[in-house]
């Protein structure tokens, strides 16, 4: 299982995996630097906590933000730019990707995403329950269904092709286990242990 370490400000400082791999996190002003296997990734945030840049060995990614904190564009190394469009309510209506083209989005009166159409005219349709919780996501190939308990916690995500993920929570509403089941009924279970409000270990079975 993974071991998590935190500093006196309750910030994550290290993740130690059973394999011996360790990831460290260092903090300086509005920047956080993560080092894993000798590779450093520096993330910088603005005064409101919004990510504005990522620097790694491949170069710099810059996030240009609107006044509401949402990105208007993201510029990757080589000046590769992804652009975003929004409606008057601040809802994303388009995403222009240099490799995959433009995706458009449509919403219902409650602001729920109803339809997503990509550059190849492939459509994803979404439905919601009376509490505006996502109920189904339907693609041409399959449908994914979402189930909740009386505490508004997501308990199951199941696909029409036979895969599923089950979630169990403790009395404090924290995720205590997650079981992923494949089409052949093989599964992976993760059990979470907490120290205060932080995950202290994850056990895989």
What are these regions (language model features)?
Residues 1-56, 60-76, 80-97, 101-118, ...:
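Beta-strand elements of repeat-based all-beta scaffolds
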